């Protein structure tokens, strides 16, 4: 919660980004990569992935999809390759993984030289997430009561945040702390189909919401029972600011933390992989032994949200890891 010591670190990300920016980027929020939400890709977040794919293929690279990794194999001199679920073995001396550090270093890596203590330290990394996902299919754009006349559509195209006070946010966290889904959750939402019309049929829209807090383990009941209840509470809360929302809902889909882990590999539903706290940042992310995108296994690199500077879609972990890999190859 906001009153937990160390959580103010998140507020430092903007000044950190500004201080590390070039002079030309000082007044351009799009080039301050830790600043936070500064724009939307046309086509949704999937457009970012598609652009990366085109860039890789244009440079002669090959992308394999639907190819689950069974094992990252290493020998006495380092990485030897990757074994796929279908039994195929791809030889390689360099592997970069943007999976959760624990998934990479504990579940997938087979290294005869890996120290048991290091493996134990990775296994013990604090990773509990508490996010709940809600997607709404809408018939038209809901009315935003706070939008000035004439600016309704402009306001609707921006991200909305429903967390009216620090006390409200702390209460939402307290519920989860004791194993209960938040009665009055924090909600961050967006209608991406306003800026990317191809995401929905004409006249229809999609609202995407990230919701906090939803503990992985519940003290009572199960997420099978609580998923729909949490979704209904979220819709009620959003409706306070958009009174015609319920009338516009065609359908919805809700994902609990367990769903996010099962479908997307987000361990414990943590979209940041690890805690975004000072104890897990800078040279300690994910551990001091592998804080510079390297690992104790020669040729294995980390490049996901479990490395500095953490989650959100900044591209910085991948960029920094690539620079490290290139410096080792030269």
Predicted regions located by residue number:
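A broad, structural surface signal
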Residues: 46-58, 74-77, 84, 97, ...
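Short, conserved active-site loop motifs that form the nucleotide-linked donor/cofactor pocket
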Residues: 61-62, 300
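Beta-strand segments within the central parallel beta-sheet cores of soluble alpha/beta enzyme folds
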Residues: 1, 53-54, 65-71, 92-95, ...
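Secondary-structure capping and boundary motifs in well-ordered enzyme cores
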Residues: 4, 41-48, 97, 124, ...
């Amino acid at each position: 919660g906001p009153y937990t010591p160390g959580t103010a670190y998140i507020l430092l990300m903007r000044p950190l980004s500004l201080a590390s920016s070039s002079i030309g980027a000082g007044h351009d929020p799009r080039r301050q990569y830790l600043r936070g939400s500064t724009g939307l890709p046309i086509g949704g977040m999937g457009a970012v992935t598609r652009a990366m794919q085109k860039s890789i293929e244009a440079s002669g690279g090959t992308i394999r999809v639907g190819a689950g990794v069974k094992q990252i194999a290493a020998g006495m001199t380092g990485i030897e390759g990757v074994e796929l679920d279908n039994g195929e073995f791809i030889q390689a001396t360099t592997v970069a993984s943007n999976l959760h550090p624990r998934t990479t270093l504990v579940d997938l890596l087979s290294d005869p030289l890996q120290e048991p203590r290091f493996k134990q330290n990775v296994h013990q990394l604090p990773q509990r997430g508490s996010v709940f996902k809600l997607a709404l299919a809408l018939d038209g754009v809901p009315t935003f009561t706070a939008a000035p006349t004439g600016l309704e559509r402009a306001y609707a195209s921006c991200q909305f945040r429903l967390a009216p006070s620090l006390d409200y946010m702390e209460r939402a966290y307290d519920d989860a702390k004791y194993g209960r889904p938040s009665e009055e959750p924090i909600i961050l939402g967006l209608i991406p189909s306003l800026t990317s019309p191809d995401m929905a049929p004409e006249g229809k829209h999609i609202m995407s919401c990230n919701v906090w807090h939803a503990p992985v383990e519940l003290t009572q009941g199960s997420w099978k029972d609580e998923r729909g209840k949490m979704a209904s509470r979220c819709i009620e809360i959003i409706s306070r600011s958009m009174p015609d929302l319920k009338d516009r809902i065609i359908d919805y889909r809700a994902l609990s933390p367990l769903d996010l882990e099962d479908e997307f590999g987000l361990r414990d539903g943590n979209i940041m992989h690890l805690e975004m706290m000072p104890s897990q940042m800078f040279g300690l992310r994910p551990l001091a032994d592998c804080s510079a995108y390297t690992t104790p296994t020669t040729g294995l690199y980390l490049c996901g949200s479990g490395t500095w500077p953490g989650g959100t879609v900044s591209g910085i972990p991948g960029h920094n890891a690539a620079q490290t890999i290139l410096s080792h190859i030269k």
